[in-house]
């Protein structure tokens, strides 16, 4: 046994033998490649599975807090820059025209809660030509920031009373309302503002975007009293049930996102004469807004929104087009596929109709050509029958004695010498028949009866010629009659 396999494995615990050294080298290499796991584990020892799965990844992200909405790092910078700009602007305002609510209010204030789903109001503004007053001249800088409930353009009403500012802003936040106070009435000329108004839009994702509102008015000679209500946004908790307060900002943002989506999908009501038509909301908010409107306005002609502004007409159109684009982007894939199939079916039906008309025209043309071909074939058949009959007549009169007598009497020489006559007798009935055949063939309308009549007339004249040998010339009338009859 040891003689057959002299090569022994020197590995501990292995006593295998091999016949040659190559097998032993391969076996030793297997020992070297074997993994050493150490002692066997007990079943009680449990190793924690740390395989990175998507579920564990999401769990780790939630623990770290990556899914929480982070505040924009530029938000504070924007706020600080806007406050600095407001502070740097020259504010030479009379004490009666400041939009700050003082301790003593001349007339009782009226609270008006604007609904979130209201459509875009008309941005219109009027002020004096002495000073250019921007939008953000209120006491609180938050009046120029639109909260993330909706992206609505505020309705700005500015009347001039020695550079006085009256601002009405539709605050779309569900946790804010508007306090309206009365300003002293005075009549001043209205002139257009030379530039747009700056505005900061606070988006739902935490970003702040600057927006410029164009302000212009068509007539600069209109005198509008300054008895327009003075409006300043004040943070208040409304009594409408179901709307969370300002203490829970996260549910407010999620609800604002849902309402924004609902507002984009539904059709906005029209805007007429700058009066905002309230959207479908709770009856309490709509009733409050309707009751506060006649109290805030003393005279019906005091509003500056009676004069239409040029950018006010383009704003609803652009909003409608953008709404259509959003609806087209948010369409259901099944609806897109259904419309695609409808267009394909319509195109296929049009193609089939065009092809049917083309095939019908080809069939009609083929029928016309086949009828014309049949007519030509019938004419050819008639002409061939006529030629065959004429050949039979010629063969029948080939050995006729009249023809032999004409040849003997020298009819050919007499025919050649006579040049004063119009028509002469042909040299033979064969030539006469050929001449008649050519005439009838050229016309294409001769018949067998006419050919027989011509042949009999020629034979009759030839018989008369044989009875009168004294005449040297015979003028034949039948050939002249045969030609008009053939024609």
UniProtKB/Swiss-Prot annotation:
Segment Leucine-zipper: which positions?
A: 362-390
Polar residues composition bias: residue spans: 264-275, 425-436
Q: GO CC annotation: what is one? A: site of double-strand break
**Where is the PTM Phosphothreonine found along the chain?**
34, 51, 53, 55, 98
Major localization listed first in the record, in broad terms: nucleus
Comp. bias regions, Low complexity = 300-316, 437-449
In-chain residues carrying the UniProt-annotated modification N6-acetyllysine: 339, 356
User: Where in or outside the cell is it found?
Assistant: Nucleus; Cytoplasm; Mitochondrion outer membrane
Q: Which InterPro entries match?
A: bZIP, bZIP_sf, bZIP_transcription_factors, TF_CRE-BP1-typ, Znf_C2H2_sf, Znf_C2H2_type
Q: Where is the composition biased (Basic and acidic residues)?
A: 328-345
Q: Kindly indicate where the leader peptide sits in this chain.
A: none
Q: Which residues form the bZIP domain?
A: 334-397
Quote the function comment for this protein: Transcriptional activator which regulates the transcription of various genes, including those involved in anti-apoptosis, cell growth, and DNA damage response. Dependent on its binding partner, binds to CRE (cAMP response element) consensus sequences (5'-TGACGTCA-3') or to AP-1 (activator protein 1) consensus sequences (5'-TGACTCA-3'). In the nucleus, contributes to global transcription and the DNA damage response, in addition to specific transcriptional activities that are related to cell development, proliferation and death.
Family label = Belongs to the bZIP family. ATF subfamily.
Q: What is this protein called?
A: Cyclic AMP-dependent transcription factor ATF-2
Record organism? Mus musculus
Highest classification ranks of the organism: Eukaryota, Metazoa, Chordata, Craniata, Vertebrata
